[in-house]
């Protein structure tokens, strides 16, 4: 950009845009500044949806299963804009973008002015001095669009390593806001030192990578507990006392003694007569009546008693409180010390030892012999049905060899990235040219935590398809119904846009169980393979489509306001009917009166009679969804969609501004359908 050649008005406009971008991005906070920075919303507003084609040969599964998931081949920014029906509908964005390691992403400088330019640009080499600013310019509009795809309570989990960690973190703080940062996961990708020190003498071998996790709105986001492991549950047992419920010993004190002074007092052991107080700074975790009942479970009567142990405090009103101890009824104390040789203590010990031998001890006990301080039974049935995820995920989550029916292998190389490679090799075979693949367990764990069982997972940098594989695997194990959208451009250096030959192939193989390493249990499901075309969608382009092209567009763009992203049309085989081309989940038929731009497209009485007949043949509900250019006939059971108007509306076309995605609210009021 040459400022000398710009007019005064152009310079003023540029400064205004710059000030607006700084104001919106920073909101009085830190604002990133780099060469070629453009406000992401200014770029997004220029991106136009593209035509899509369904490749039935690559699609997998039954017709209704194909409608559940999407693998899309194409540039991801255009793809996300094209997937308008999913705007604001995604539960989790889980993705692994280019790490800027050198020649791992392409950038076209023309995208700054025209993001619709079809040229993908050149690979950015490691030696490029502007590689960081190019990476930021590449990522910024895509992250903005990922945020737009999320539900209000949606979450994004984005993988990165040390090369762009700091820049990505600042960018995420700008776009998602710092207050919406859930955490930064530090996962151990290797457990043995390697020669990789980042190209620097005296450097450190990189053993960890990171996942930055942000919510669209942290007040609406939900972090789910992970499933408990067998190892965790094995700590609970009932063989000690024969208790029918499994338990383990735990602390009977809690924090915040300063605000719970009445719960700081002595309790007397029924075995030894010794007095026990909570640890410094802590208080008993249970109410005093509960503690008294548990102590009396050992056979002796207890009482509240001031034992002159100086356990007192003054409240905020200046009132002095003497906190009484829980002691065996009838015992005598002098200055907080019990008088020795009391018969009450000997009798209490006899009763307590008898109870210990009989089994099923009270919840408060004094060790396995009665000689230690107080402990509390923690019952498995009372524990949360899961565990809270931490920000450090160590190697034990990823080192377990992947089982393939009767076959399994151990790691030939140290490092958890190799686990991902092994998993990919097992499914599709070697020779895929992928050197780094995320482990299946890593992605599965993230999905479990931040995507509900019937939610949608989006991966705009799908790569080898690990995210889709993980969704299917988690669904299969838990009986869930999560859906995925995978977007992959591929790399055409070798003439192979691997969205078909690798991404879709991996998903197909795990669905069917047809792994390269041998037959495995099929995970089930299906997906629709969509190809993003270069042709932009507008009224003229829609009106010029042939029938099969129009059907592809309708199948990929149609949504019902009452269901939005859950709207899925199952396509019927071509040639089955003259007008009927799909059905929805309510068994309602979708009919297309269209044979090309030069043929009549009219819903009249005669055509409607034929539509009713086709619906009866397929035993469909009496609700008819009809796409046509004109509709002189109408009826209470007819839902009419005008071509091209309603088609454009379903992909986010704003007719008032004659532009796409021009601040269109996804909940804009439209006619039902």
What are these model-predicted stretches?
Residues 72-74, 158-160, 395, 460, ...:
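Short His-Asn-centered micro-motif
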Residues 93-98, 157-161, 215, 460-463, ...:
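Generic beta-strand/beta-sheet core signal
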Residues 473, 477-673:
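PRPP-dependent phosphoribosyltransferase catalytic core
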Residues 91, 153-156, 181-183, 455-458, ...:
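Residue-level recognition of the N-termini of beta-strands and the immediately preceding loop/turn
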Residues 86-87, 107-110, 171-173, 471, ...:
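Short, glycine/charged-enriched secondary-structure capping and boundary segments
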Residues 34, 136, 163-167, 174, ...:
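Conserved S-adenosyl-L-methionine
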Residues 3-456, 672-673:
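Class I S-adenosyl-L-methionine
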């Amino acid at each position: 950009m040459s400022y000398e050649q710009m007019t005064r008005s152009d310079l003023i406009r540029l400064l205004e845009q710059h000030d607006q971008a700084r104001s919106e991005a920073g909101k009085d906070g830190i604002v990133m500044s780099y060469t070629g920075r453009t406000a992401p919303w200014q770029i997004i507003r220029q991106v136009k949806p593209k035509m899509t084609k369904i490749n039935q040969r690559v699609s997998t599964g039954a017709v209704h299963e194909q409608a559940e998931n999407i693998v899309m081949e194409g540039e991801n920014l255009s793809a996300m804009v094209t997937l308008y029906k999913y705007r604001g509908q995604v539960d989790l964005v889980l993705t692994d973008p280019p790490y800027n390691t050198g020649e791992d992403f392409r950038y076209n400088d023309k995208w700054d002015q025209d993001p619709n330019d079809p040229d993908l640009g050149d690979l950015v080499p490691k030696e490029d001095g502007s590689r960081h600013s190019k990476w930021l310019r590449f990522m910024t509009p895509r992250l903005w669009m990922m945020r737009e795809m999320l539900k209000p309570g949606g979450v994004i989990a984005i993988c990165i390593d040390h090369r762009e960690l700091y820049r990505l973190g600042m960018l995420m703080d700008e776009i998602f806001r710092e207050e919406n940062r859930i955490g930064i996961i530090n996962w151990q990708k290797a457990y043995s030192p390697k020669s990789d020190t980042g190209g620097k003498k005296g450097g450190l071998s990189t053993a960890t990578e990171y996942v930055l996790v942000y919510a669209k709105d942290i007040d609406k986001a939900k972090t789910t507990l992970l499933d408990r492991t067998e190892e965790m549950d094995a700590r609970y047992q009932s063989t000690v006392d024969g208790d029918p419920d499994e338990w383990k010993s735990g602390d009977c004190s809690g924090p915040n003694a300063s605000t719970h002074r009445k719960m700081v007092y002595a309790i007397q052991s029924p075995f030894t007569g010794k007095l026990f107080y909570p640890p410094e700074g802590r208080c008993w975790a249970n109410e005093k009546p509960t503690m008294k009942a548990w102590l009396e479970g050992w056979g002796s009567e207890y009482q509240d008693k001031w034992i002159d142990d100086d356990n007192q405090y003054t409240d905020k009103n200046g009132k002095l409180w003497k906190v009484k101890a829980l002691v065996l009824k009838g015992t005598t104390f002098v200055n907080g010390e019990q008088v020795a040789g009391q018969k009450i203590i000997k009798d209490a010990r006899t009763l307590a030892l008898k109870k210990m031998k009989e089994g099923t001890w009270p919840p408060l006990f004094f060790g396995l012999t009665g000689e230690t301080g107080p402990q509390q039974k923690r019952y498995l049935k009372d524990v949360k049905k899961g565990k809270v995820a931490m920000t450090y995920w160590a190697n034990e989550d990823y080192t377990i060899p992947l089982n393939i029916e009767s076959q399994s292998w151990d790691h030939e190389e140290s490092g958890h990235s190799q686990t991902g490679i092994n998993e990919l090799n097992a499914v599709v075979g070697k020779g895929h040219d992928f050197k780094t693949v995320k482990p299946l367990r890593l992605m599965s764990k993230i999905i479990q935590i931040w995507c509900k069982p019937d939610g949608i997972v989006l991966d705009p940098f799908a790569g080898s398809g690990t995210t889709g594989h993980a969704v299917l695997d988690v669904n299969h194990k838990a009986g869930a119904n999560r859906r995925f959208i995978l977007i992959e451009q591929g790399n055409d250096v070798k003439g192979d846009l691997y969205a078909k030959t690798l991404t879709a192939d991996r998903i197909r193989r795990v669905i069917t169980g047809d792994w390269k390493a041998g037959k495995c249990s099929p995970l089930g499901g299906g997906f629709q393979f969509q190809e993003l075309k270069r042709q932009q969608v507008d009224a003229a382009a829609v009106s010029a489509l042939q029938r099969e092209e129009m059907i592809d567009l309708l199948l990929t763009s149609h949504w019902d306001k009452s269901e939005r992203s859950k709207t899925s049309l199952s396509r019927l085989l071509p040639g089955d009917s003259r007008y009927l081309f799909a059905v929805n989940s309510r068994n309602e038929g979708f009919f297309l009166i269209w044979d090309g731009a030069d043929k009549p497209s009219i819903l009249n009485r005669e055509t409607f009679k034929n539509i009713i007949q086709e619906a009866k043949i397929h035993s469909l509900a009496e609700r008819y969804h009809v796409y046509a250019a004109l509709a002189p006939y109408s009826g209470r059971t007819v839902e009419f969609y005008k071509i091209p108007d309603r088609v454009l509306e379903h992909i986010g076309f704003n007719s008032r501004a004659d532009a796409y995605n021009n601040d269109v609210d996804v909940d804009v009021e439209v006619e039902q359908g």
